[in-house]
Each structure stands twice: as C-alpha cells, then as structure tokens.
C-alpha cells in the first residue's frame, strides 16, 4: 500500500509538471529523489541506504569457514562447499549448494567468494525468493567457461532471478571470456547469422538491489543487465572490453524502475549505458564513458514494437573517444514515446557525434524500409554540454517526418571540432521550446520562423 500511495504522489508530480512551464516538463531531480527515498524508507520501515551500507561491510577475514558473526549475520563461504578456485575445476556445484544454504536461511547472510582465487563457472542462476536478505561478497575472480557448448541458454552466464533485498559487491572481477564469442558475431563476420551471446551478469525481477564495487571485463555480450527490477542502486563499477568487441554494452537497463547508476567507468565496444523500453525514473551520475557508443536511450521500436521510456536524467558525465555522446535511437515503424529526458553537465572529448537523436536507426545488414509510424521523442533537455567533436557534425537531430521531435530545450552548449575548428548542426523535423547559447546551432532553413525567435546565440 505504501508503494501505491507514493506512486500516486509521483504521478501527481509528473502531471503537475506537464501543465506548468516548458522547463517543468522534466521532473525536478531533487523532488524525484525525495519521493524515491520516501518510498524506500516507508516500504521497509528503516533507512534503506543505511541498511545497504550495513550489509555491504567487508567481513574481516573473508576466508573463514561458515559462521555467524557478532551482528547475527550468517557467513556462508563457497570454499566450505568444495569450491576450488583454481581456474581449472568447475565450481558450479559448490556455488549452487552454498546459495541454497544462503537462500533458505532465516537470518541475514553474507555469501562469500574469497580473494586470491579464480572460480571457473559454467552457466549458473541464483534463484529466489529467499527467506532473508543476502549480501554477496565477490572478493576473488569469476571466470566464464570458454566452452560454448556449456551454455544451454545463450542469453546468460550468471543470473540472479527474483531475489529481493540483495547486495552484490566486494571488489572482485567478473571475466566473461568474450574473446571466445566475439568472432562468431554477425557484426564481426557478416556472413554469419545474428545470434545471442550470454550477458555476463543479469539481474531479473529483483527488488531493492544494490550492486557496488565490481569489475566486469570481456563480457560475451552485455556486461551487466537489469531487467524488470525495481529500486536499484548501482555504483563504483569498472567495466571494460575491446572497442571492437560486438554488442558489449556496459550497463543495460530494461523494464526497470527507480534505478540510480553512479561513479562508474565504462569502456566497451557498444553503448556504455543503454536504457530501453519499460524503464522509468533512471538516474546516471558521474559516468566516464569511452571507448564505446555513448550513453543511449534505446534502441526503441524495433520490429514495429511499442516502446516507452520516461524520466531519465544523465548528469555529470565525461565521454571520451566514443562513437556517440548522448543519444536517443528509435526504429521506423515503432510506436510509443521517449519523454522527459535530461542530459546535464556533460564533457565531450573527441566524440564522433556528441549529441544525436536518430529516429531512422537501422542496425542490421539489409536496409530498413521507410515506414509511417515512429516512437515519439519529446521533452528533452540538453544543458551545459561542452567539448570536442571528432567530426564536423557535432549535433545531429534526424527526427521523423510524421512524428517530429518536440519540446527540445538546449542551453549552454559549446561543441567545437578538432583543434578548435567550427562544427555544424544538422536538424531535421525538430521543434524547440528554447535554445540559448548554443554552438553549433540549427540554421534558419531547418527550423520554423517562430522557433528561430527562441534562439539566443
């Protein structure tokens, strides 16, 4: 009931903002945070952030065999269930038995993966619901099996399914051994059919989740995915793969509500962060991205599907040497809406397309046919974005003829070419609510006469 009452409050705030000024079309971040924190605190009758911090404390000796510590937390160590951690022996059975013990515990649990060891794992799923809260401490390294035949479900390697009140951290490394998979990608070898490769770490249907202080490298495909989750805090992540690795998104957010991603460094061969349909109330703060394809909303609307993303704020990002900076990408033929999106305080360095909306996205070998419908893009704010573009076109709005981009606000934008050379903006079917101090800017031929009056260069 608490969630329902607060959700109604949040909807009232959204509605009120939509009938106010142009700028208020996007929810005020401080107000959003107040409501978000209030939902968490009332739902669990305590300070949720303090609760997460308490569960995340490192135990002093992470090689101890199972015990109950002085705080009443049961410590379950995978070594006591037979894990070898030698990088040669599969440790799935030990991990599964340890998880079953942890998940059935009536008291809070620390699930410990000790340091200085390399645990070889086939495909594995840690399933809930569990009886109590669990903090998974990965101090060592988890290494994926390099045998493709070990993956009956090609969509995942490590997954947490329907686990509530979960913390995952410890500073260890998740190594997907993606080098085994990448050559078989249709993006590397265009003669091959396009097939899934596993996501290294998937959280599905998890509520009240914290993922903190982890390293992920060389994922088979996506590094970390949050799917159908609610109330997520992800921070202090280090994610890296080759710039030429296919589809290796850093953090992928799908159908997830109330998620905060912060203090994270990502360099991959695809989107640093990708936010797709069903996601709402997403905040990404202090993100370093590059190489990769930037921070993206989408893609949305593929296969003529309906897609919705709303209330997304990207604040304080540094994007270096990436294909794109901040991007919204939708396919022709889709429907739905991407709305109430903010890109604030972003520094670009040698980025091919620093600001881009692409409503004609086509990520396949064969050409995409022209279609009438499109996902509507509206109420997007770009504010305090500066830096250098690796190409002449620093701002690219390629919006739909039938469903143009609406309610676009740009303030304090300064993007130049290499060595300070002038850059350009290309703007098709875009309608502005305001544009102040924007370099480069759309030409008078690309926008209406009324919109031209909004510009204050």
Curated annotation (Swiss-Prot):
Catalytic activity: (1,4-alpha-D-galacturonosyl)n+m + H2O = (1,4-alpha-D-galacturonosyl)n + (1,4-alpha-D-galacturonosyl)m
First and last residue of the signal peptide: 1-24
First-level EC class: hydrolase
UniProt-listed Enzyme Commission number(s): 3.2.1.15
Entry's localization field: Secreted, Extracellular space, Apoplast; Secreted, Cell wall
Functional pH dependence: Optimum pH is 4.4-4.8 at 35 degrees Celsius. PG1 is resistant to acidic but not to alkaline conditions, at which PG2 is released from the beta subunit.
Active-site residues (renumbered): 270 (proton donor), 293
Positions of PbH1 repeats: 228-255, 256-277, 309-330, 338-359
Post-translational modification: N-glycosylated. PG2B isozyme has a greater degree of glycosylation than PG2A.
KW Repeat (keyword) present: yes
UniProt GO MF annotations: polygalacturonase activity
InterPro entries (UniProt xref): Glyco_hydro_28, PbH1, Pectin_lyas_fold, Pectin_lyase_fold/virulence
Keyword Signal: yes
Domain of life per record: Eukaryota
Similarity remark: Belongs to the glycosyl hydrolase 28 family.
Note: To avoid liquid rheology of tomato juice, temperature and pressure can be increased to inactivate selectively PG2 during the process.
Name this protein carries in UniProt: Polygalacturonase-2
């Amino acid at each position: 009931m608490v969630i329902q009452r607060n959700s109604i409050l949040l909807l009232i705030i959204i509605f009120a903002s939509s009938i106010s000024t142009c700028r208020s079309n996007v929810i005020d971040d401080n107000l959003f945070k107040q409501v978000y924190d209030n939902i968490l605190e009332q739902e669990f009758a305590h300070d949720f952030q303090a609760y997460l911090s308490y569960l995340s404390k490192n135990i002093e000796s992470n090689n101890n065999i199972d015990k109950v510590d002085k705080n009443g937390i049961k410590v379950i160590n995978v070594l006591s269930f037979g894990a070898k951690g030698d990088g040669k022996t599969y440790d799935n059975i030990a991990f599964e038995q340890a998880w079953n013990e942890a998940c059935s515990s009536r008291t809070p649990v620390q699930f410990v993966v000790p340091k200085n060891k390399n645990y070889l794992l086939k495909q594995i799923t840690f399933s809930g619901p569990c009886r109590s809260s669990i903090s998974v401490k990965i101090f060592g390294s988890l290494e994926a099996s390099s045998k493709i035949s070990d993956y009956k479900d090609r969509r995942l390697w490590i997954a947490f399914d329907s686990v509530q009140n979960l913390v995952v951290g410890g500073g260890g490394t998740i190594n997907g051994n993606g080098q085994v998979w990448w050559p078989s990608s249709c993006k590397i070898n265009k003669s091959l059919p396009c097939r899934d490769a596993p996501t290294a770490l998937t959280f599905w249907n998890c509520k009240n989740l914290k993922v903190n202080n982890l390293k992920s490298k060389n994922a088979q495909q996506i590094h970390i995915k949050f799917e159908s989750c609610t109330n997520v805090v992800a921070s202090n992540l280090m994610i890296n793969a080759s710039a030429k690795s296919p589809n290796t998104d850093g953090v992928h957010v799908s159908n997830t509500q109330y998620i905060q991603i912060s203090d994270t460094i990502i360099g991959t061969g695809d989107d640093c962060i990708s936010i797709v349909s069903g996601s709402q109330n997403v905040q990404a703060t202090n993100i370093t991205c590059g190489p990769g394809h930037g921070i993206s909303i989408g893609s949305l609307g593929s296969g003529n599907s309906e897609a919705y993303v709303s209330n997304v704020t990207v604040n304080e990002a540094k994007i270096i040497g990436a294909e794109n900076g901040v991007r919204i990408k939708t396919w022709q033929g889709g429907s739905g809406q991407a709305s109430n999106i903010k890109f604030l305080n972003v520094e670009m360095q040698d980025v091919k397309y620093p600001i881009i909306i692409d409503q004609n996205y086509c990520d396949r070998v064969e050409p995409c046919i022209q279609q009438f419908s499109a996902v509507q893009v509206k109420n997007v704010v770009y504010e305090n974005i500066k830096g250098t573009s690796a190409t002449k076109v620093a701002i690219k709005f390629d919006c739909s003829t039938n469903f143009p981009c609406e309610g676009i606000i740009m303030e304090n934008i300064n993007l130049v070419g290499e060595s300070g050379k002038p850059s350009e903006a290309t703007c098709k079917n875009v309608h502005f609510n305001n544009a102040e101090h924007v370099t480069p800017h759309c030409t008078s031929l690309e926008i209406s006469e009324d919109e031209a009056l909004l510009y204050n260069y």
